[in-house]
Amino acid sequence: MITVRTIPELRAAIAAHPGAGRPGKRPAFVPTMGNLHDGHIALVRQARPLGDVLVASIFVNRLQFLPHEDFDSYPRTWEADCAKLEAAGCDIVFAPRESDLYPEPQTFKLQPDPQLADILEGHFRPGFFTGVCTVVMKLFSAVFFASGGGTAVFGKKDYQQLMVIRRMVQQFALPVEVVAGETARADDGLALSSRNGYLSTAERVQAVQLSAALRALAQAAQAPGAPPLAALEQQALQTLAQQGWAPDYLTVRQRHDLQPPAAGAAAGTLVALGAARLGSTRLIDNLEF
């Protein structure tokens, strides 16, 4: 496994790799912000057979953090991350410095569809998906430029992000196949997240309540004669608040566009999504049903 810092170095490393540079040979790519856990590594292992050279990026993207969020304190665990990536079969780690990826102010930014990107996470974190789309487009350009395309793996844990990236790829006719990876969970059901490390011991025990709330909401929505979704969502919010959380949203949406479902929406087409703060830690999760 090799590590590169700049876009020219990355493109040269991909071209020089034995699995690339031949007709029909394409990269597989997993973008990360580092501080890797088993969920990230599952995505890397999933990507391994999907390309001829496997690239993972480590970059904490300032553009997707609000001023009051944890950009400066976000854990940087470089040596441990590289060891995990190498063990998972990664060929190239692209770890640009901010000056490498943004050598000048990024005045051109992608503005995603507000119907998809200004709801849910985008409502509570304004500008988040502009930052995500801008950096992902730049990473796609860096990784897939020479090959003319390839495969990128994104986790369902960040469900709305996955939908936004898929829409971006479709809208710009990018030669990238976006593959979804299932959410990795701890034994008690908590979705693995880099921010779980912010939880105290007591909060970590309590944190499973978010996934339990989503499961209960999904079950209630499918019950015969269920009340209107708005009433079920309000009840779920109240229950989580009574348990000591500060919830942003708990809601049921259509999977394909994250809009409220039509009456009688078929099972297998919906997703329950939630975001809530426990102490100082904001967690998100989702459950397809």
From Swiss-Prot:
Short name of one Pfam family: Pantoate_ligase
Tell me the subunit arrangement: Homodimer.
**Source species:** Acidovorax sp. (strain JS42)
Biological-process GO terms, alphabetical: pantothenate biosynthetic process
The name this protein goes by in its record: Pantothenate synthetase
- Positions of ATP binding: 33-40, 155-158, 184, 192-195
Q: Which domain of life is it from?
A: Bacteria
**Subcellular localization(s) per the UniProt record:** Cytoplasm
